Amino acid sequence: MECPFCKRFHDTPKQIVDASKGNVNWQWKHMPLDFHNPAAHKEALAAECIAEQKGNRGFWVFVNDIFHHTQGNGGGVADLASVVTGVGADLDAFRECLGSGKYEDKVEADIQKAKSYGVNGTPATFVVGWHNHTGKSQLLGGAQPAQAIMAVMRKMMIESQQDDSANQ
């Protein structure tokens, strides 16, 4: 969450999901880059600890608040505790979770999965085939505008419909 391009891109997924009327979902995967660490890695772990306490909505509110408060480029958040309490999380439970390292494996698995798909920078977006059944996906690197992502989605939807018609 230290990536300045991710910060710029952050509102784009919400715009797409909101405009989709329930047809699009967005899944977050962590990929703290080495030159943004240790702040980016700590924020990834922190987001998971918030999700444990506050659920999916709490996770997204926290991520939004981190993007709002971070100095960026590895500078971190000056007062992480205030961001934590600002989303209504219990600070002691959060500190215990963060100190336990219980989400280290999850964050590392996200990093390794991204690398296995050829992702080497952030943000990165995978558009997965229409209704997730085509098996097709396309990687879009960088802070793409909503229109570019929507164009790929439309193309995949049309291809899926053509494939369905051909198979009938």
PLM region descriptions:
Residues 11-17, 81-168:
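C-terminal cap of thioredoxin/glutaredoxin-like
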Residues 1-85:
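Structural alpha/beta surface segment adjacent to cysteine/selenocysteine redox centers
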